[in-house]
């Protein structure tokens, strides 16, 4: 018996909750200064119930070749990676209209 998704009620292999969630999320990508004047790119606005933020952070860190962490449903990447992060999020299925890069 296949597992049932608790959100949509469909079997896990037919579930589209994550794809729908990717299209509806309003994601903000911005840079802040941290200790000693270092820059940090913050990717914020994920719904942690629908998207695996830790897995997404791992993919972003691997592709950007930088360090980073997950804090309160936001991803922090070391350095200025705004353009690269936007391109990666679009390739992962997030809507370009819903990504706000500052």
UniProtKB/Swiss-Prot annotation:
Annotated TM spans: none
Gene Ontology MF terms: mRNA binding; translation initiation factor activity
Keywords: Protein biosynthesis, Translation regulation
InterPro entries: DENR/SUI1_TIF, SUI1, SUI1_arc, SUI1_arc_bac, SUI1_dom_sf
Gene Ontology BP terms: formation of translation preinitiation complex; regulation of translation; translation reinitiation
Family matches, as SUPFAM superfamilies: eIF1-like (SSF55159)
Matching PANTHER family: DENSITY-REGULATED PROTEIN, DENSITY-REGULATED PROTEIN HOMOLOG
Similarity section: Belongs to the SUI1 family.
Name this protein carries in UniProt: Protein translation factor SUI1 homolog
């Amino acid at each position: 018996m296949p597992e049932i998704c608790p959100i949509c009620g469909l079997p896990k292999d037919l579930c589209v909750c994550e794809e729908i969630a990717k299209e509806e999320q309003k994601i903000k990508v911005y840079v802040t200064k941290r200790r000693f004047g270092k820059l940090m790119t913050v990717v914020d606005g994920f719904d942690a119930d629908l998207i695996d933020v830790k897995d997404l952070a791992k993919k972003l860190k691997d592709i950007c070749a930088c360090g980073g962490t997950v804090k309160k449903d936001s991803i922090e990447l070391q350095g200025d990676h705004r353009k690269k992060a936007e391109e990666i999020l679009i390739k992962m299925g997030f809507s370009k209209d819903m990504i706000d890069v500052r």
